[in-house]
Amino acid sequence: MRKYLLLFLAFFGSWSMSVRAVSFSDINYWIGEGNVEAMLVIAWNDGKTPGALAWGYKGEEETTIVEMLNDVVKTDPRLFSLMRRQGGYTVDGLGFDLNGENTVALVVGGDTTYPKSNATGQFTATPNNFKKWECVDKEDHWNSPSVSEDGVWHCLARSESGNEAETEINKMPIQNRYTYIFYYDKPGSDTPDYANAVAVEPYIQDAVDYSQGIFFVNEDWYGWD
C-alpha cells in the first residue's frame, strides 16, 4: 500500500472522532499560485468513506471556479473529471483514486475492452454519451448520471462566516477564503455531508523499480524488456 494512502487513512481515523467542519488550517495540500486562497471540497454521495475530500487552492482574482477545479484535477493524479463543453463547462462526473492503485480509467457504453485513460485526468463527454460513462475501479470514488439513474453535480460557495449559496462555475471568480463545494445530488438521496470533509494528503509518487523490467506499449506491439 502506498505511503500517501497510509497517511491518508491515518488522518481519516483521527477525523472520524471529530464533528467540527473542515477549515483552512486543516488543509495539507495546496495547489496553484496566487494571492487568493480558496478551498475545494468534493462530496461524492456514493456510500464510500471518507465521503468528502478537501484541497487548498491559490489563484488570482480572475480565476474562475471551473478553472480552479480543472487545475486541481490536472495537478493531483488521483482526481479525475468528466465534462461537457458547450458554451461553458458542465461537470458530469468526478472521481478519486480512493484505494491508491493508480487505475484511473473510464469506460463508455460498457466497452470494457478499451477503457479510456487521460494523462491530465480530464475526460470529455458529449450530449449523446454523457450518461454512458463508468469508472473502471469500483472501489474508487465516482458519481455521474447514467441511463438508469439521473443525477447532477451542484456547486455551493461558502463564505468564512458560513453563508452558503449555489453558484455557477464558468464566469464566477473565486473569492478569498471561500470554500467551493461540489456535491452530487441524485433522486431519493439526502444531500451528502460535505462539512466534515477530510483534507487530502499531498500526492507522493512511488519510485519506479526498474529491476523488475520495463513494460513497453507501442502501436502494434507490447511486452516486457
Language model regions located:
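Sec/Tat signal peptide C-region and signal peptidase I cleavage site
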Residues: 15-21
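Ubiquitin-like/PB1-type beta-grasp interaction modules and other compact soluble beta-rich domains
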Residues: 21-224
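Sec-dependent N-terminal signal peptides
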Residues: 4-15
